[in-house]
Amino acid sequence: MLNKFVIKLTICIWFGATGLLAQSNLKKASFIPHWSPQAQFAGYYYAYETGIYKKHGIDLTILTGGPNHPASVLMQKGEVDFASLWLTNAIQLHAGGVPVVHLTQVINRSALMLVAKKSSGIEKPEDMNGKKVGIWGGDFEIQPTAFFEKYNLKVRLIPQGGSINLFLSDAIDVTSAMWYNEYHTILNSGLNPDELNTFFFSDYDLNFPEEGLYCLEKTYARDPRLCREFVQASYEGWVGAFEHPDEALEIVLTYMKNAKLPANRPHQRWMLSRMKDLIFLQEITGNFPELTEKDYYFVAEKLRDNESIKFIPTCEKFCPEWKKSTDRKTDK
């Protein structure tokens, strides 16, 4: 009897020690999404809550992003290891002296759009001439500005906050929207898709790849394997979230409630579905979409043209993980 007890005790101690050793071998890292908790970041939350980051050897802390905790500022200060950023934001940071580097693209297709009611008579870009257009600031105004210039439009720009009320009340003729967010809010307000005309910038040769994962150059140089494991774990988190949407939504809603944000399940479900469309387009592949050299330089040149940056960082400097192609460009 005593021998059995000793054997069981030894097994428990061994498994406990093994677990502690595994925990001690985890590398600590921090990550901040570029906005407040919502299904736009479901893959990262899912990977964390289901132990995927730990499986890849990472003891991750996920910080709460949003307007009060800008990911770009924390990255600039070196207060976070990894961040999700829009490509436009990351290029401006790098060109401005903050050595952020691109680890992977997450969304290659722009979800930014303009929306007009059919009752306004706006059916094509030229119909916006002289109209009142709601526009966000910062990175969100780069594509609309290029769009208006492309079609030689003189519009009345109206600063747009986080609400679509100006559009619903006809105080503006056209509103800015993200496909996975505000567009669905418009539909929930009582307007049907067949009552709206949508203008996706990606359909007008102004596609800007959006969300990607980034770190500082020194983080990558110090531990490139950690960076790759973080990317792979994040990818697996997104696949898991899409394969188990109900579980992923529960996780997202919990994060939103903890951040004291209003949580609407149908809206978050729409957002999660659209994220799947944006990340994988047709079907789930074995990895995140790749940022192409063509797309990188296209966006960078637009930023230089509107004087957001003074020079274009080379792909070699900006994308240390970038796969070389046979027709790549040299320094710009």
Residue ranges and their predicted role:
Residues 1-9:
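Bacterial N-terminal signal peptides that target proteins for export
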Residues 8-19:
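Bacterial N-terminal signal peptides
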Residues 24-160, 164-180, 207:
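Short, glycine-/small- and polar/acidic-enriched structural segments
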Residues 61, 69, 199-201, 266-273, ...:
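Short linear loop/turn motifs
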Residues 88-89, 162-261:
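Pocket-lining segment of extracytoplasmic ligand-binding domains
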Residues 154-157, 193-197, 258-274, 309-316:
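Short, surface-exposed acidic
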Residues 222-306:
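Secondary-structure end/capping motifs
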Residues 295-332:
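Conserved C-terminal helix/tail region of periplasmic/extracytoplasmic solute-binding proteins
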